[in-house]
Amino acid sequence: MLSVEEFRLLVSRLRGNVKFLYFHLMGEPLLHPELPLFIGIAKENGLVPVLTTNGTLLGRAGAVAEALPHKIQISLHSHEGNCNGGLQNYIGEAMKFALDASSRGTIVVLRLWNRGGRDSMNGEIESLIESYCPQPWVERYDGWRLAENIYLEYDNLFEWPDAERDEYDCNEAFCYALRNQLGVLVDGTVVPCCLDHNGDVCLGNLFERALDDILSSPRAKALYDGFTRHEAVEPLCRRCGYMSVTKRFRK
């Protein structure tokens, strides 16, 4: 588990290079006992903290709301995918948290990123949400604005990268990896995107090297230049459903 001292060091090496700090790269951030402190450290260093959670622990996350992260994304689609408990209680806890956090100024995004997959419960989820945030809702390009600082967002299901699966057969590829995101694992490993939770595309270690040095490495530059040409040069990228969904980048 990442210590406070280690987190401070990583933040110091990200400061000035990134704007948003997402507690997001696999795992459940609400499991970390120092998360409220981490949020404060990020803000002290001029970073904008954003959380992504599966929502199962929101009933005991009051201290997180009090820490005032910029945004919290709740992946409601994880319930149907993992069959965790009763839907009504799950949505109830999520909505109570959303109403509390949003009233403090935090943006809350309720995510249903399961279109084309396990989405049979979406209608029931929407009805439960409506009991906490009554209509009318304001339509947006990616979903709805439900209330002040509360949004419902949809997206298509995609296959996560898997080094063991076959490569996708696609004529062109694209990804925002190293364009507007990178990832740092708990051991300091820098990866190009938030989907590489195993560190298969290790670009360097932030505990050992400066971020500028890591991003200027031959491997990092080859990945970036490859996607500029709409080509996935890394084997893991060629096995990722996100880069192959080219329509995603033509909205």
Q: What residues fall within each predicted segment?
A:
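Short glycine-rich loop/turn motifs that provide flexible caps or phosphate-binding loops at active sites
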Residues: 26, 187, 203
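A C-terminal junction/extension of Radical SAM enzymes
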Residues: 100-193, 231-246
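Conserved glycine-rich "GG(E/T)P / GGGxP" loop and the immediately following alpha-helix
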Residues: 1-141
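Short clusters of hydrophobic/aromatic residues that line enzyme substrate/ligand-binding pockets
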Residues: 2, 58, 175, 203-206
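Flexible mid-to-C-terminal extensions adjoining Fe-S/redox cofactors in radical SAM and related proteins
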Residues: 190, 195-251
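Structural motif
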Residues: 18-20, 179, 201
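Short, solvent-exposed loop/turn segments at secondary-structure junctions
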Residues: 29, 56-58, 77-81, 113-118, ...
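Charged/polar, solvent-exposed surface patches and flexible loops
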Residues: 9, 96, 127, 131, ...
